Structure formats: C-alpha cells, structure tokens
C-alpha cells in the first residue's frame, strides 16, 4: 500500500505565530506517518539525503560565507562534507526502527520509537553543517525536525534544510518532515522550543539556557573554553602545528577549538619560537595588548563581529600591523580569572591566550581554572609523550571536561572520528552536568529515540545446593570418616563441640578413628548453647594455631553454627560480620559476596540432635555478647562439605530436646513446602520429612533409644527438611520464633510450635492484603500447598479447606502429645514485658531474613496481632481462611 503524505496546506512562509502553528500541525501528521516506516525505507531516505547534502557541500559553503562573512570557505566545505559523509558512515548500519534487540532467555525486547518533532536551533558559526547534521540524525530516527536559524545565517541554513528535505521526499519521506522558520525571531524560537518534543540546541549560553528552561527535554551544549597543556615531554613540532591546524580551521569557530595554551617553563621559548616560525604573531605587551582587548571585547564580552574573523583582520581592527598571512594572534597573559583577563574567555577566532607554568602540576592547575571559568564540561587538550601515563592520568582526573584529547587538534578531535575513530562524529557536543547539559557525550541518533523495553514474565532460575557428600545410616560415622584419611589424605583435624558432649564422650569414637588413620587432632569444646562471637573467636584462634586441613563440628545446631563461623574466621579473618549478616532479597544478588571457602580446610558436620538440619544448610547464627546483636549469616559458602547423619549420635537425647527439635523439623518441612521459592526438588524432601515426623516423633518422644528406628527416621527427617529449607528457605513462622527466643528466651523449637498453626491459618488466606514477591509464585496458593502436603501425610477431606482443617487438627494433636503448651503466656512470659517489647519484636520479625520467602507478605500490624493472639490464646479473626 502506498503511504500518502499529508497535504501541504500551510503557508509557504513561516514568519508569524499562526504560520508556525500551521507548520507544526502539518509536521505532526508527517511524523505520524514517518513513524510507520520500516528500517529499509528509513535507510534509503537517510542515504539519499546524505548524498544530496554531500553533493552540495561547496554551494552551501559559499552561501554561508556570503551571508555571514565569517570563517574560511574551504573549511566550511570540509564541515559540510563531514556532516554528510561521517554522520552517514557512523549510523548507516545502526538500527533505529522496530525491534533493536531481543533476548529470548531473559524475555527482554527493546523497541525503538521516534520522539516526535525535534526543535533545532542553529548557530551562525556553523550554519549549513549543523543543519545537515541535525536533519540527517532526525531522518535516521523517524523524527520530524523544525529549524530555527540564526537571523544572520537564515538563508544558507534554510537552503541546507530544504536541500535535505527535497532529497528525503524524493526518496519516499513524507512531505513536510523537515520545516523551518523563514523569518526568525525570539518569539518564534521560543514557540518552537515550547511546542516541539525535544530540542537540539547549539549556540551561545543564553540560547542553551532558554532551551533548558523551555519545559521540554533539551540536548544543549555549553560554552567551550578548551585549554591546552604542552608538557616538556611533548613533541613540540607536533603540538604547535596541531594547534595551528585546529585553531585556524574555519577561523576557530568550532566550539572545541583551543582557546589557551599553557607551556612548561623548560620548553616555553622553544614553543614560542615554533609558533612564530609557523606564522603566528605574539601581541606585544602594553599598547598592542590593550588595543587588541578593546577591539575584541565590549563590556567584558566578546564582540559579536569577532567569531570567524581572520587573524590579520582582527589585528587591523585593533590597529596592529601584522603580516597579511598571520595565522594566529597569541596574547601572553597570566591571570585565569575571566573578570580580570578577557583573553581567558572563549574567543571563537584565531586568537590564543598563552600561559607560562613552572611545572606540569602548575600547568594542570591553570588548565583546570580555565575550564571551570569558561567551558566546564566541554573539551581539554594535552600534548605529552604517550609513555607518561601518570601525567595523562592526572590530567584526565583533574579536568572537568567530557572530551579530553591527547596529542590531537582539539577542533577535529572533539567532534570525533577524525583523530580517534571510536568517538562518534557530531556537531553537538554535550558537556554533562559540569556544563549544565543533559548529556556528556557527542550527540547522535541514540539521543533521538525512545526505547521501549518489553519485559516478559520469566521465572527465576532455581537451584538445589547440598553438601557434596551426605552419609547416613546408623553406625556410619567411622566409615564416612575413613574417607578423610584414605581418600583425601587429610593430616590435621580440628573438632568443634560443646562441653556436655565432650565430657559425655560423644567425640571419643571420632577421635579414635582419627588416631587410627594417623590424623593429628585438636578439640575446641567450649561452644555455648547460644554460640557467641567471642566464643567463635577463641575457637578460631585455637584453630589458627593448630592449622587443620579438616574441621569436624559435632553437636546440635549451636556446635555446627559455631564451627561454620570458626571456619569462616580461619579461612578469611578479614571479613566483617556486619557485612556478612546483611539481609538480602535474592541470595544471588546480595551486596556482600562471601569469599571462597575450603582453601585451608574441609568442613564435616556431624549432628547429635534431630532438629536444626544445620549439617546441610548454608546458615549460621552467632551472637555478639558485647552488643547483644545476633548475626544471622546465610550463604552457600557456609555449606558443609560433608554431612554424617548417623542416628547412633542422637540416641540418648532427652525428651524435652526430642520434642523441641522434633517439632522444629515439622516447622522446617511445612514452611519450606509453602515457601514462594519451593520447587519440585525441595517439595519431595519437605513432604517426606513431614510424614516421617508424624509417624516417628511420638515414639521417639515416648520410647527414646528403645525405638532406634524412630530415632533414625527423625534424624533423617531433620536432614531432609534441612536440605529443603536450605534451598526453598523458611517463612514468617521462623521470623516470629526467632524474636520470641531472642526477647523471651523460649527454646527455638517450642517458639515455632506455639505459633505454628496460627501462622498457617494466616498464610492460607486466599485473598491476603499482600502476597510474597517471586516470579514463580503467581498467585496466593498456600492453602492448596498445605492441603497437598497433608494429603501426602495421609490426611483426607472433601476439599482443600477441609483437608487443611484436618491438617491443623493433626498438628495440634501432635503438639499436645509431646507437651507443647497452648499459648506464649503458658511458658511464663511476663505480660507487661511482652507488651513492652511487642512493637520492637514485631519490627524485628518483619525484618527477619526468613520473612521474604513467606507466601503471604505480612504487614507489621498483622504480625503484632499474631503475637497477641498467640500470647492470649485468642481465636483467630482477621486472618482466617477466606
């Protein structure tokens, strides 16, 4: 289908507000049509427009010289050529339409859309080349562009724009896609800025400020005041001739051109002589200098006639007699203060200030002052031997300039792609925040497109991490340990345990096996029930003196946690606990990266209780006795290398420990099953662990060692639940229990048990205020998951709700059987102290690491109600199943 361009119903001349309004309306239609073009169509238009501009480079240059009387014809030809050829070459293969990129794995699509109408303000210094540049990048990005030319260069600017428009339309672009103000005025320029979608502003500080004040996005450039430093290691011939080449290019009207040169004392005379040899004139101090000042500056500002004027002409204006072919007028000055020294300003003409510096540091300081005073963010130049890396580094760090060119003519180097081919070519040079600009690079096509990012839902890559070796079965400890000596060749073992287990002989069999294998060993047996940082430091110090290559932690969660912390201290004593304990939302994206473990020692965990599952988890909790702060550490770096799950090590556990640890296993199983991070790999372990607890905890509690099978099954259940929550994590139940233990000293397993079924009811709500945030958790599903686990455990019902209620009943029966009390108050927690600490306890529970994986994301007010209900034994109200 042939696309129809909007009819041209606007007046031929845009010289008033009504005409401009009509022009912009027509351009809106044209751009809407242009926005539907394919990349192939756009590239054809871009090619033909660039070709037409390049063919007309000489006529356009002549028009610019004739109209403005500024600059050098041949250089304007080069600028036009550059604006057409280099811009086309830079972007001919750049995708600017439709899909820019597509990442199937991450579900990300980036789509280019045009911005709309570009408002372009064109200076008198580079009228035709800037018009070519801005129209070409607008065409490449499917934008319309309206040009507001400088009044002193309106004809040549419009001629350049019309030439590009005609070529573009002939190649298929909509008519009116490029427009201009025929009779420019401040009123119409302000209207352009107000009514377009983005402004490309090139010109003086006042105009750029107006663009940024328009209320529309603006890509404006600040003033340039490029300082040059010539170091005493520089190639003087290269430096001087490069500066002359740059400064005389179009009589200095490129904004990146050199405005001053600072020379080191040892080569000052050499540089000066080289400038003179090459046709530059040093203005004499006194009358000549003052005459030149008076001619060039009016009321402290550059006279509008000066930009682009030849050196000899400026000298004539000042009444200074110089050779007709003088290339540059050089004024030797000392002050960098623009209020005191006019020659420190931007001059946009072949006039250069020259400063003397005793050393490189002073030269850099001078250049820094000049940049900040007159051209912050623009360009700075250094001539130095390439091997002087320290000097180059100092210069680039001190200069607040967005373009720092080394051994390069700054006019040519700043605009890009002439002396360095990685810098994009441009005639609009951003100066960043230092220059009050929105961009700090050379403006190009990427700045004229909006990029839509289409993000499709993806589920997180999950994982399953466990110790590389998990040995189990009653009596397996000596067989598993045999591997340390006979397979791994370990020589020195360090045992970590507590006093009770050590004195009770629980480590003797391990020590005997180590002796049998000829492995030297030492033992730290001072682990506290609530392991402290101070205890861990003592153990780590003893460990460092012994220098083990294997660590064996024997005991319950406390001994294994302490062992992990000592292992970390032994391997990496430089680590800070406050950093390691930082909470995370995603363990793979945490701010702190745990260091690699195992370079010094292999870690073996041997549990003697059936509850924490710490032998196969990446977690450890340590308390700083001096501050009272608990440091919960979580990272797979802390995962033991080997776990030995031998029921012989837990046969003598007393009833109270059996009950508390056993119900802790059940809580681990249930919470890991309904976690938003649960997976098929963890759910099987959670289900099996829960079933084993229902089947074996009553007998293990009642009969103890008389039922070794029940003891072994509980030991296995503890490890399986540990592996499940090591990968799926836990939830609010544990968050609240952690704080009950910390504030009111309830044993952890019992703290979990007393709130377990209340938290389950809370989570099972099908219309919660908030749900957990994780991509693979699409909607509230805890009720179904609870019912699914219950069914695996043999609990029945007509639907999920009934199964869930029966599950709750079965859990309450189990809790009653092992002696779990009904309320927090029943455990002797003082009511007033409970209420006094409730708010702090609530906030800390909310902030607990476990909370994030809970299926229902809790409000603090909800946590508080759960605590109160569990304290007083109130019937659940606002969190019942919906």
PLM-predicted stretches and their roles:
Residues 35, 320-460:
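Conserved C-terminal structural/oligomerization subdomain of aldehyde/semialdehyde dehydrogenase
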Residues 160, 534-648:
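Glycine/threonine-rich beta-strand-loop-alpha-helix active-site module
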């Amino acid at each position: 289908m042939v696309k129809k361009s909007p009819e041209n119903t606007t007046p031929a001349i845009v010289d008033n507000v009504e005409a401009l309004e009509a022009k912009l309306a027509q351009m809106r239609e044209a751009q809407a049509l242009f926005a539907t073009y394919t990349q192939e169509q756009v590239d054809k238009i871009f090619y033909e427009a660039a070709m037409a501009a390049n063919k007309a480079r000489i006529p356009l240059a002549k028009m610019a010289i004739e109209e403005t009387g500024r600059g050098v014809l041949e250089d304007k030809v080069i600028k036009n050529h550059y604006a057409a050829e280099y811009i086309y070459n830079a972007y001919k293969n750049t995708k600017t339409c439709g899909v820019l990129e597509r990442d199937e794995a991450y579900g990300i699509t980036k789509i280019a859309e045009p911005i709309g109408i570009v408002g372009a303000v064109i200076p008198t210094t580079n009228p035709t080349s800037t018009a070519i540049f801005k129209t070409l990048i607008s065409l490449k990005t499917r934008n319309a562009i309206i040009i507001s030319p400088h009044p002193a260069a309106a004809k040549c600017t419009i001629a350049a724009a019309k030439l590009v428009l005609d070529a573009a339309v002939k190649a298929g672009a909509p008519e009116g896609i490029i427009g201009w103000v025929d009779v420019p005025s401040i009123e119409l320029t302000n209207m352009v800025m107000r009514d377009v979608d983005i402004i490309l502003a090139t010109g003086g500080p006042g105009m750029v400020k107006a663009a940024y004040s328009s209320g529309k996005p603006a890509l404006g450039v600040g003033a340039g005041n490029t300082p040059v430093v010539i170091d005493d290691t520089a190639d003087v011939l290269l430096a001087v001739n490069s500066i002359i080449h740059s400064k005389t290019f179009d009589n200095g009207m490129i904004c990146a051109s050199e405005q001053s040169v600072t020379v080191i004392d040892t080569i000052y005379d050499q540089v000066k002589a080289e400038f003179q040899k090459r046709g530059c004139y040093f203005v004499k101090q006194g009358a000549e200098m003052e005459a030149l000042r008076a001619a060039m500056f009016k009321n402290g500002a550059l006279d509008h006639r000066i930009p682009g004027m030849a050196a000899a002409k400026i000298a004539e204006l000042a009444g200074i007699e110089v050779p007709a072919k003088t290339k540059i007028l050089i004024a030797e000055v000392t002050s960098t203060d623009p209020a005191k020294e006019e020659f420190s300003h931007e001059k946009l003409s072949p006039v250069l200030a020259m400063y003397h510096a005793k050393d490189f540091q002073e030269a850099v300081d001078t250049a820094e002052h000049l940049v900040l005073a007159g051209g912050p963010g623009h360009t700075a130049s250094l001539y130095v031997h390439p091997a002087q890396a320290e000097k180059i580094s100092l210069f680039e760090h001190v200069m607040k300039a967005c373009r720092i060119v080394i051994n390069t003519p700054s006019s040519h180097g700043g605009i890009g792609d002439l002396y360095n081919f990685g810098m994009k070519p441009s005639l609009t040079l951003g100066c960043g925040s230092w220059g009050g600009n929105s961009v700090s690079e050379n403006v190009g096509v990427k700045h004229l497109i909006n990029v839509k990012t289409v993000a499709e839902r993806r589920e997180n890559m999950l994982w399953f991490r466990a110790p590389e070796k998990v040995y189990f079965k009653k009596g397996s400890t000596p067989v598993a340990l045999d591997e340390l000596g006979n397979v791994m060749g370990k020589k020195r073992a360090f045992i970590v345990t507590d006093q009770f287990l050590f004195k009770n002989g629980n480590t003797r069999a391990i020590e005997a096996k180590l002796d049998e294998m000829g492995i030297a060993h030492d033992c730290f047996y001072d682990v506290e029930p609530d392991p402290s940082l101070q205890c861990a430091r003592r153990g780590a110090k003893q460990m460092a003196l012994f220098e083990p290559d294997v660590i064996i932690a024997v005991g319950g969660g406390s001994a294994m946690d302490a062992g992990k912390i000592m292992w970390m201290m032994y391997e990496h004593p430089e680590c800070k606990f406050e950093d390691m304990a930082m909470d995370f939302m995603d363990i793979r994206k945490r701010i702190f990266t745990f260091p690699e473990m195992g370079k010094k020692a292999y870690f073996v965990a041997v549990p003697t209780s059936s509850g924490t599952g710490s032998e196969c988890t990446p977690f450890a909790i340590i308390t700083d006795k001096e501050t009272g702060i608990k440091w919960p550490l979580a990272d797979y770096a802390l995962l033991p290398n080997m776990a030995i799950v031998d029921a012989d090590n837990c046969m003598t556990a007393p009833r109270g420990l059996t009950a508390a640890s056993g119900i802790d296993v059940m809580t681990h199983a249930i919470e890991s099953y309904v976690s938003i991070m649960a997976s098929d790999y963890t759910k099987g372990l959670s289900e099996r662990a829960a079933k084993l607890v229902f089947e074996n905890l009553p007998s293990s509690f009642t009969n103890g060692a008389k039922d070794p099978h029940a003891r072994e099954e509980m030991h296995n259940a503890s490890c399986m639940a540990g592996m499940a929550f090591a990968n799926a994590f836990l939830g609010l139940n544990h968050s609240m229990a952690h704080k009950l233990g910390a504030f009111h000293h309830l044993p952890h397993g019992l703290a979990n048990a007393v709130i377990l079924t209340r938290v389950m009811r809370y989570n099972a709500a099908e219309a919660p205020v908030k749900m957990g945030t994780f991509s693979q958790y699409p909607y509230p599903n805890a009720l179904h998951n609870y019912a699914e686990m219950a069914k695996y455990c043999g609990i029945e019902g007509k639907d999920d709700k009934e199964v869930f209620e029966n599950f709750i009943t079965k859990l309450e029966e189990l809790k009653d059987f092992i002696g779990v009390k009904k309320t927090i108050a029943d455990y002797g927690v003082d009511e007033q102290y409970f209420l006094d600490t409730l708010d702090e306890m609530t906030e800390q529970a909310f902030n607990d690491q476990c909370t994030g994986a809970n299926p229902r994301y809790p409000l603090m007010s909800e946590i508080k109600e759960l605590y109160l209900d569990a304290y007083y034994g109130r019937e659940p109200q606002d969190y019942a199943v919906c």
